[in-house]
A protein has these predicted regions:
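Terminal targeting signals and extreme-terminal segments of soluble enzymes
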Residues: 1-76, 82-148
Length: 148
């Protein structure tokens, strides 16, 4: 596989629990942020994410925890499309500490494309399908200041 899209985010104090590790529910937040940045980088126009052109809802999310992340770690989240159907698609996520190889968390998340008013399923247009297939390969969004 070519280099997937990467999103870098720093773990903040309020995202950690009494065990001094990232609270388990926060991984869903990181995945949601990475999905948004992936779509912003991959879709034909960044506005497609904001203007209702490509409205999505999460319908299934499986998260597998392998090791803890801690306060001030920089998480490197790799994102790619695994399957693209008629109205839904699956994104895969791998979370690691930036610069390290060991997996902390993996996720497969299924999204359905919906009409922004009725929330009924909507077919994924060919140009959006092509954008998901290409997937912003090789691009990185750094909200941690890690690469600066």
């Amino acid at each position: 596989m070519t280099t997937p899209f990467r999103y870098l985010v720093r773990v903040r104090y309020q995202e950690c629990d009494a065990q001094h590790v990232v609270f388990n529910a926060r991984y869903g937040d990181y995945i949601d942020l990475a999905c948004f940045e992936f779509l912003r980088a991959a879709l034909p126009s960044p506005r497609d994410v904001f203007d209702g052109t490509f409205e999505i809802q999460t319908v299934r999310q499986v998260v597998e925890w392998k090791a803890p992340a801690r306060f001030d770690d920089v998480l490197e989240i790799s994102v790619w499309a695994n399957r693209i159907g008629t109205t839904s698609f699956t994104l895969c996520f791998e979370l690691r500490r930036a610069g390290e190889g060991a997996l902390l968390v993996t996720s497969e998340t299924v999204y359905v494309h919906v009409d922004p008013k009725s929330f009924s399923k909507r077919e994924i247009e060919p140009r959006m399908r092509a954008a998901l297939e290409t997937g912003a390969r090789g691009k990185t969004t750094d909200h941690a200041g890690y690469l600066a």
